[in-house]
């Protein structure tokens, strides 16, 4: 579509599975991308089948048959007869169901909490002892914070993360650190800088990475400085590769809009900054950018080899930008073990030889009053952001992804798409 407006893209990348740039250049999936997506979507489905089969005591064959038949649109009574649900009730009746489960009388009260308030809750039953810091890294990896009217958009800002990790390294009360990462990656340079900060922190105290639903590409890169990596079987990780998309607006600017350009320069490449605006990218410029990407990929591969104690040849076999599901990642040694955040905290305590410990969140989560003031005052576009979420639904994340394209650094270590599993 962009070509219709006179906008073209030149792709520089390493890794046949690094498919982000297909957004700019192709009208369908490449065979390599279809291969990796089929693999991890199939793996996610098999994990879901196993979990539901065990929980509901329903055979996997039956579940597959239900899925094929669009059971979601069947009569609700069928859901019960097929053991997919236990019963039916209206919203106002759910409290009585919970009370029965808790052994409470119907006239007794129960406290309720919004799921957002417990989404990142930590088991704090042990509030005494040495501190284990839990540091949250969520969103796209960037060099500097980019102000946005879309307020709730989270970022991993390398300058801030480095400063925070240095402070944790110097904090004598903190005996170990858990990095809770949920990110599809981002700026390759920023990922390298955070990697070093993690590595330097790990020299002073154990660092354990706890991967959420996604810790891929640049997010995996920064994890290589840690001592131990934990993920879930359904985590998307790996994606060891780098790409760049060089936009060329010259047709739009000169032919469709009629702008005229001229230049005076002292050296052959003095006018490098005009590439893609007043003229197309030259062959020399494209080759230079490809070499730049190649060096970035080789460095990424080296960091993985060092962090995972592999040879570069071993890394190359599982790299090429391929995204791996947690179950596969464990088998090919991209991660050390399975577990959630509480398991990662326990592992950090073990590595730090702590028998009594408490988890402390960094950066500290905003208090309820601060959140209330943000909502009331529309701080950082929170109100607009929420309205966009409501209006766009599943299209919200792709919208943010497209909006961010113009702000990205040219060389990226990022997951190639927004994943929406339905």
Regions found by a protein language model. Give the residues of each.
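Cleft-lining beta-strand/loop regions that shape enzyme active-site pockets
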Residues: 125-252, 294
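Extracytoplasmic
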Residues: 4-7, 47, 61, 66, ...
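Charged, glycine-interspersed solvent-exposed loop segments at helix/strand-loop junctions
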Residues: 2-97, 250-332, 336, 342-348, ...
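Intrinsic disorder and flexible/low-complexity segments
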Residues: 129-132, 136-171, 364-422
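Short, well-ordered loop/turn and helix-capping segments at boundaries between secondary-structure elements
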Residues: 4, 200, 213, 228-231, ...
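Active-site proximal loops enriched in glycine and acidic residues that flank catalytic Cys/His/Asp
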Residues: 136-139, 181-183, 211-213, 233-235, ...
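Short glycine/threonine-rich loop-to-helix capping motif typified by GTGT followed
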Residues: 188-193, 328-331, 371-376
């Amino acid at each position: 579509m962009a070509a219709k407006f006179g906008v073209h893209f030149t792709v520089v990348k390493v890794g046949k599975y690094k498919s982000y740039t297909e957004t700019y250049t192709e009208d369908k999936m490449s065979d390599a991308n279809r291969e990796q997506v089929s693999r991890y979507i199939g793996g996610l489905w098999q994990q879901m089948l196993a979990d539901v089969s065990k929980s509901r005591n329903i055979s996997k064959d039956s579940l597959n048959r239900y899925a094929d038949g669009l059971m979601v649109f069947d009569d609700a009574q069928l859901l019960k007869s097929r053991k997919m649900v236990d019963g039916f009730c209206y919203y106002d009746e759910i409290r009585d169901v919970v009370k029965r489960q808790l052994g409470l009388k119907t006239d007794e009260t129960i406290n309720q909490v919004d799921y957002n308030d417990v989404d990142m809750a930590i088991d704090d039953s042990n509030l005494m002892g040495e501190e284990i810091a839990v540091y949250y890294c969520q969103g796209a990896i960037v060099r500097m914070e980019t102000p946005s009217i879309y307020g709730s958009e989270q970022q991993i800002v390398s300058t801030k993360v480095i400063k925070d990790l240095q402070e944790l390294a110097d904090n004598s009360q903190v005996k170990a650190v858990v990095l809770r990462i949920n990110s599809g990656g981002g700026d390759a340079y920023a990922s390298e800088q955070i990697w070093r900060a993690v590595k330097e922190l790990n020299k002073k105290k154990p660092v354990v990475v706890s991967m959420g639903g996604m810790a891929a590409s640049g997010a995996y890169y920064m994890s290589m400085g840690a001592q131990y990596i934990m993920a879930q079987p359904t985590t998307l990780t790996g994606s060891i590769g780098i790409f760049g998309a060089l936009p060329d607006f010259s047709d739009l600017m000169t032919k469709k809009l009629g702008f005229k350009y001229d230049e005076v320069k002292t050296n052959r490449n003095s006018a490098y900054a005009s590439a893609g605006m007043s003229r197309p990218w030259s062959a020399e410029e494209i080759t230079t950018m490809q070499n730049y990407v190649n060096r970035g990929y080789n460095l990424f591969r080296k960091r993985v080899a060092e962090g995972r104690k592999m040879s570069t040849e071993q890394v190359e076999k599982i790299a090429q930008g391929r995204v791996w599901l947690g179950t596969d990642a464990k088998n090919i040694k991209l991660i050390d073990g399975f577990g959630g955040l509480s398991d990662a905290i326990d592992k950090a305590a073990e590595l730090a030889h702590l028998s009594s410990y408490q988890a402390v969140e960094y950066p500290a989560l905003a208090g309820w009053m601060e959140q209330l003031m943000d909502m009331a005052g529309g701080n950082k576009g929170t109100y607009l952001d929420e309205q966009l979420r409501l209006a766009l639904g599943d299209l919200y994340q792709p919208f943010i992804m497209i909006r961010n394209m113009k702000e990205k650094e040219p060389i990226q270590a990022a997951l190639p798409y927004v994943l929406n599993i339905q």
